[in-house]
Amino acid sequence: MTSWADIQKLASDLQRVQLSQSSKKLSEVNCIEVLQKLIASHRIDVVYTRDGHSYVTKNHLETEIKNECIAAGGRASLTDIAVALNIDFDHIEKTSRLIVSTDDEFTISNAEIFATEYVHRLRNELRTLLDEQGNQTTAALCKHWNLSSELLQSLLIEKLGSSDFQGVVDGDTIYTSSFLNARQLVLRAILIALTKITPISTIQKRVGLTPKRFWIAFENLQSLGEIPGTLIGSRTSPSCSYRPMMYDHLVKSCVLNQYRQNEFLEISTLKTLGVDAKPALEEVLGSSEFKKLVSMRSMFMTKELMDQCINAVQEDLQKSGISDVHLALQSLNLPLDTADEDEIGSKVANVEKDSHFAEGFVFKGAVLTEALRSIDKLLDVRAHEEVDRLEAEKKKQGGAKAAVKVQEETDDWGDGKKGGKGGKKNAKSVKGGSKSSAPSTSSNLSANISINSEELEIWLRESQSVPEEILSVIVEKLNQETTTLLRKKVQDIQAHQLVASVANSKKSLSAIGDKCRQLYDSFNTFETATSTFADPLGSDLRQYLLKTVGNEIALALLSYVMGVDNAHQLKEKQREETIENLPEMLRDPIRSVFASLKSTDDDALDKFHDAVYNCSAPSATSLALKKVDKKGRAEVGAKITAELHEQLCSQTEPATTLLLSVLYILAKAGRPTTASGKFVSQLVAQIKDLCPENVFDLLQACQKGVVTCIKNKGDEVAKEMLVNDISSLKQSIMP
């Protein structure tokens, strides 16, 4: 910088020039010319003002800029300096950057130049603010001083580590040590004053520290042993809470006082206190007291209080035989929920003999007995109605002609596959003989007898023997029992009617005996015809014969020894019970007949004949069943042929008509056979020599048509062709 001596020298030179003669002075034009030559020769470095009338050296410009900055308080805008000095902004900015690069006491940022004096003033002002408030954020300081955060950081905050600053810079906040110490003491006071579990977020908000400074203060207190409590959960969790020791003491006192006063503890209260877990409760009460508690859904209670609850319900139950658990427990004034009351009701039902619990009521078995007694007359009326219905259905079944049975599986009419053995569940058959076509075993009609819950509820409501509150419960418990009782009454009535009909048993026995003989004659006739077919067809037909006609013979024999023609109505279990109750001389032969039906050995028919012979011996039924001779077989065959002819005349269903046609041709040829639809394809191949060629062709066409219609039920063209072929077949084989 220019010294005072230089200034004095310039002043003396100026005075000397002013005192010289005019001839020795330079005119303004000469001065300008001289300066231009000096500038052109780079002898001097100057900067012109904006109007071009003045100039200043760069060194002097630096001095002017520094003076302007200091005059503005240490902070001046480059734009304001350019206006004040009347110099272009670019020269001002360039010179300012040169100043900053050479002088550490100045800095530039955002088109502003700052002097060290300004930084000192900011530091003093910051110290004052911190002394007043204890902390300041950089955002607030930036707004207060109109500085950018980066500039504030570089000018002030980064230089606060000196010994004259007693504080901490944490992130974007500046704290004084005294402020942090005061906040730590506030935290200590809060932690000591708390008596309940409090979220850490609430405590932190009250202390007024950032999470980082809060946990630093917390750890400082913890290291000093000044934390009278524990943390619940992770520090980083939003649900982290503080549990003071005083809270544990108060909770324990509260739980113990409630337990001693009430003899129960509500789980909702324990949850609020944070001791709902069994280990925590055991720690509060002690192991011995905890073992005395009865755990329920909404509370823990002592065994003595549970006994009081049970006794209250028992006393109410003894009065009327019915107890509303909720009302019975009201006198104890306990906050029980429905699940607790149900548990107590179940305990009472287990303790009280012949008691039941349902829908909040405990009631004695006598209530059920009285309810049944009140509807006994209604059950009697219903039983007679059911007996009449069963008799009507039985007569309807017995009066209807047995329909011709046709195999329903789609592969039964196939192209020559081996026929399945007789007696399959879904196999249907056609067999000749006027008496040999008895219906197969039907389901026991009495199994359909029942009383639905709606009807039972109406009966009980009308009888007024059951309180409305437990009516639905009684209905549910008695539903099966009333059905069983009704069936027993029906059986008793049927048994009574059976005894009344014993007078007509002789005629019935004679008819059943004739039926047995006719069935056995048909069986022998069919068996003889099966021997004309080669195996495996012959063996399959014999097995089928055994499962169908043989089964009917066995049922007829059982009906004969029972004296009532209803063996076909019995289920297998009932049939076995009936056989078991027969006298020994009848039981073993009848059982042997049924056992032979299940045999699949080659000698199954021989076993069946032996069993039938033993059953018809004088020591058993005295029916004297025997194999029919050739003349007898011819008579039976004629009857079968006549019946098949009659059925063919009335039959219109194509599949059944085809089966009847095949059986009719075989019967006319002296080979009467019983078979189902699955044997049709094999039997057609066997009768090629028994009928004219055109009939055989029609049989094959019909057989293919039946298969096509079964597989393609919507094919109307195939159905029409089949109907035409069946019509032609009937006309061809019937005279």
Curated annotation (Swiss-Prot):
Q: Which UniProt keywords apply?
A: Transferase, Ubl conjugation pathway
Q: Where is the composition biased (Low complexity)?
A: 429-445
Q: Where is this region: Disordered?
A: 389-445
Q: State the GO CC annotations.
A: endoplasmic reticulum membrane
Q: Which GO BP terms, alphabetically? A: negative regulation of NF-kappaB transcription factor activity; protein ufmylation; response to endoplasmic reticulum stress; reticulophagy
A Pfam family name for this chain? UFL1
* Family listed: Belongs to the UFL1 family.
The record's annotation in PANTHER family points to: E3 UFM1-PROTEIN LIGASE 1 (PTHR31057:SF0)
Record protein name field: E3 UFM1-protein ligase 1 homolog
Q: Which organism is it from?
A: Caenorhabditis elegans
